[in-house]
Amino acid sequence: MNYFSMENHNFRQIKSEIRILGIDDAPFTPRSEEDVLLVGTVFRGGQWLDGVLTTTVRVDGDDATERIIEMVNGSRHLNQLRVIMLDGLTFGGFNVVDIVELSERTGLPVIVVVRKHPDMERIKRALKHRFSDWKARWRSIERAGRIHRVESREPLYIQTAGIEPDDAAEIVRISTTRSSIPEPLRAAHIIASGVTLGESRGSA
């Protein structure tokens, strides 16, 4: 079930150079009280990097949705963007993004992309164990709606707000050009880890 309350964006034709903002977080110290860097890369499809945006969120905090909204709405790229793509629903540990609110307040559809099907019950147990406000965090996760499998170079899993799953899947496939994940997310990961560690490591 998709909880998005507005009409989904109607993509009559998805162009190969659709402007995508891909967001990933940098490496961080788990369960710390530090801020973690978020990097957003503006891509034309999966081919050309047009810009880089940054913000920070608190590790295991509750500010990810608001900080991403501020980053997007304050960007000179806003009018060219057609979709936001996130590497997972959480950043900096369990700082959960409410993708319905993100879509509503930016006016852009949101696609969450992960490599493996999330174990929702395990996530819920972890939230209950660690956070007094676990119910609010869990509501944001539930609002992301149904998980859909996408056949690309390798299978990926997506959740969406403000966009039909079939359109989201096509955008994922269009932007997956050089590895098994969409290029905007791959580039965001490389930049975020490189800036934080001095050299990029791992994969998104």
From Swiss-Prot:
One of the Pfam families matching this protein, by short name: DUF99
Signal sequence interval, chain numbering: none
InterPro entries xrefs: Endo_dU
Coiled coil stretches, renumbered: none
Family from the record: Belongs to the UPF0215 family.
Protein name in UniProt: UPF0215 protein MTH_1316
